[in-house]
């Protein structure tokens, strides 16, 4: 083991533990300009900076009741420097509510040479300098998304290794510059595979990821894991939440060290309600679970809100109420106490799956 110790060592551990506070989770609001444009177009709103700012202000200035269910918000670079209509930086709004600002630092995926359409994530060049700039701007954690797919021969060992080591290099660079790295090896739900295949692939990918993190001397106590839940493929028959929970927790038990403070699941195209119900089932599983099991949801926290808002100022209160409903549901799910929604809002049961999803 290396004798290297980041000057941010204690701060990293404290911030990772804070983000993993039981009952709280992360709002992923780090969509690229192109991706948020697709969200806005779905409600017939033009993708211009003023509308993106208005949506983010709606999200970040929701009532304190909403913010009490969050410990972190992941921002896109544009958003890190944006302000409310009254001129207050979003970073200050979040900090005053006790919510840590985070930042997406990867530059998207590119095809991995020598594979059948598999990808690797770019963005390591200049990452240290960017992390220092983001830390100075108020960010305290970061996100990097690696993407793997399940197929007849995928993911290949080459793809698993390349993505695991990319995540590890990103993680140690973040820690050297004061940012808690969220490690996100997402296995896409695309395909007709059953849950057993997803479980086996998830275990392989997570095992390789933690081997790489160890090789790079990453401080695990100062990291978070953002994995997929273990589910059947999008074209396969669905299974009960209890089955998803059993396979998901087992995969984590077999691969994720107890030193990791929290696992914050991605929603992976599940509907808002489906993601909450499955997270609740995961937290109801008995047995060894040394990590907080929480959420880092984007689409699965925002869909009802978008529908309620529709780009209209007069709908902001209704949209924030919808956001509060989903945030409260997911907070309860992290504690295993969510009872399900008796009256689902518009969009809450709508599948959010997009094939070959790009953030």
From Swiss-Prot:
GO biological process terms on file: glycolytic process
UniProt-annotated site: Necessary for preference for fructose 1,6-bisphosphate over fructose 1-phosphate, residues: 359
GO cellular component terms attached to this protein's record: cytoplasm
Location(s), subcellular: Cytoplasm
Keywords, sorted A to Z: Cytoplasm, Glycolysis, Lyase, Schiff base
Entry binding sites for substrate: 52, 143
Catalytic activity: beta-D-fructose 1,6-bisphosphate = D-glyceraldehyde 3-phosphate + dihydroxyacetone phosphate
Top EC group: lyase
Active-site residue numbers: 184 (proton acceptor), 226 (schiff-base intermediate with dihydroxyacetone-p)
EC code(s) of this entry: 4.1.2.13
CDD domains hit by this protein: FBP_aldolase_I_a
Top-level taxon of the source organism: Eukaryota
Protein name, entry field: Fructose-bisphosphate aldolase, cytoplasmic isozyme 2
Molecular function (Gene Ontology), one example: fructose-bisphosphate aldolase activity
Pathway participation: Carbohydrate degradation; glycolysis; D-glyceraldehyde 3-phosphate and glycerone phosphate from D-glucose: step 4/4
Keyword Magnesium attached: no
Family: Belongs to the class I fructose-bisphosphate aldolase family.
